[in-house]
Amino acid sequence: MQNTAPVPTTTTASKMQPFNNSLFGSFDDPILNARAAQVALADIDVKNVPQLTNPLMRPHDMFSYSNYFSGIHDTSAATNIYQGLPSSSEPFDASVVVPTSSDDQMTPLQQVMAMQQSYGAPPPFQYNMTHPFSTTSIASSNNLARYPIAPPTSDMDTDPRQLETFAEHFKQRRIKLGVTQADVGKALAHLKMPGVGSLSQSTICRFESLTLSHNNMVALKPILHSWLEKAEEAMKQKDTIGDINGILPNTDKKRKRTSIAAPEKRELEQFFKQQPRPSGERIASIADRLDLKKNVVRVWFCNQRQKQKRDFRSQFRARSAAAVMGPRVMPVLNGNNSNNNLKQGQTTYNGLPGFFD
């Protein structure tokens, strides 16, 4: 004879969920668990139970843990007991929970104790309550402000008007020192500044004419300013200190003017009248005779020819001016114009000077 299972009554069936092969059917009932959670939330006292939740947590986040009863039953055999409750990302709605009789609910104090034993602190996957302006972010921003990426530059160094003023001042001082733009470019390598080498003449020219880009002007200004200071200091000490460390161009000292005595000078003039353009052998023989250097004799003959040419040009200009501005002779006319051999308006010039008298 087969034993038939008793048919559950209507009251008992309404309180049960479909059979899920669990020995703890009353605990797996989502309606009972939701009702108990609602009552515990309504009756809880924050002052008496301060360690229950994080004060920054929202009320519906306290019941978002899906398996805080995992120590009571096997999770592989049981279903989720909070299928009827909203998740932490959705607002809590008390109307979802279906009310039951007071005989089926748990004691609020027992529910609170069970929650404290199951989870004393929020799990790591709980809602992140980090403040957007936390101390960590403030500290990191302070570190960034303390160590800037690029060193600050003064407004005076980047002002276009200041750059223009310095470029004009640099050009005037360079000309006064007698240094060319190419000499400045070569002298920059002697400044011993890191990353600074010689520059071309065109770069210095473009700096003085303000045709470089603004960034290149700003970068080149302190370099040229440093050279200008050292060049002026070297110019002041040039008479006392021979070595100027390549800041100024190494120019040779000016040669002394060669003076020829009067007797030798008279003999040279006689040789010049005889032959204004002597050959190299003739210059060498004259130098040996007068005990002078060959180069000195050659330069004297060259200078003498230039002097003769200047004198000839000045005489030619003087005679040309005298011919144009000379006296004008008016024609002598008789009473009868027909017997006059000169036509009216004809003029004669007497004593017209020649070009070479």
From Swiss-Prot:
Summary of subunit composition and partner proteins: Interacts with mec-3; the heterooligomer binds to the promoters of mec-3, mec-4 and mec-7.
CDD domains tied to this protein: homeodomain
Coiled-coil regions, chain positions: none
Effect of loss of the gene: In a number of neuronal cell lineages, one of the two daughter cells of a division fails to assume its normal fate, retaining instead the fate of its parent cell.
Highest taxon listed in the record's lineage: Eukaryota
Phylogenetic placement of the source organism: Eukaryota, Metazoa, Ecdysozoa, Nematoda, Chromadorea
Keyword ATP-binding: no
Keywords carried by this UniProt record: DNA-binding, Homeobox, Neurogenesis, Nucleus, Olfaction, Sensory transduction, Transcription, Transcription regulation
Principal subcellular localisation of the protein: nucleus
DNA-binding region: 253-312
Name of the protein in its database record: Transcription factor unc-86
Family: Belongs to the POU transcription factor family. Class-4 subfamily.
Domain POU-specific: residue ranges: 155-232
Listed GO MF terms: DNA-binding transcription activator activity, RNA polymerase II-specific; DNA-binding transcription factor activity, RNA polymerase II-specific; RNA polymerase II cis-regulatory region sequence-specific DNA binding; RNA polymerase II transcription regulatory region sequence-specific DNA binding; RNA polymerase II-specific DNA-binding transcription factor binding; sequence-specific DNA binding
Subcellular location per the Swiss-Prot or TrEMBL entry: Nucleus
GO biological process assignments: mechanosensory behavior; neuron development; neuron fate specification; positive regulation of transcription by RNA polymerase II; regulation of transcription by RNA polymerase II; response to mechanical stimulus; sensory perception of smell
Short motif POU-IV box, span: 35-44
Pfam family of the protein (one): Pou
Effect upon mutating residue 210 to F: In u5; defective mechanosensation, lack of interaction with mec-3 and lack of maintained mec-3 gene expression. No egg-laying or Q neuroblast lineage defects. Abolishes expression of ALM neuron-specific genes mec-17 and mec-4
Tissue expression profile of the protein: Specific to neurons and neuroblasts. Expressed in CEM head neurons and in IL2, URA, URB, URX and URY neurons. Not expressed in olfactory sensory neurons but expressed in AIZ interneurons.
Transferase among keywords: no
GO CC annotations, alphabetized: nucleus; RNA polymerase II transcription regulator complex
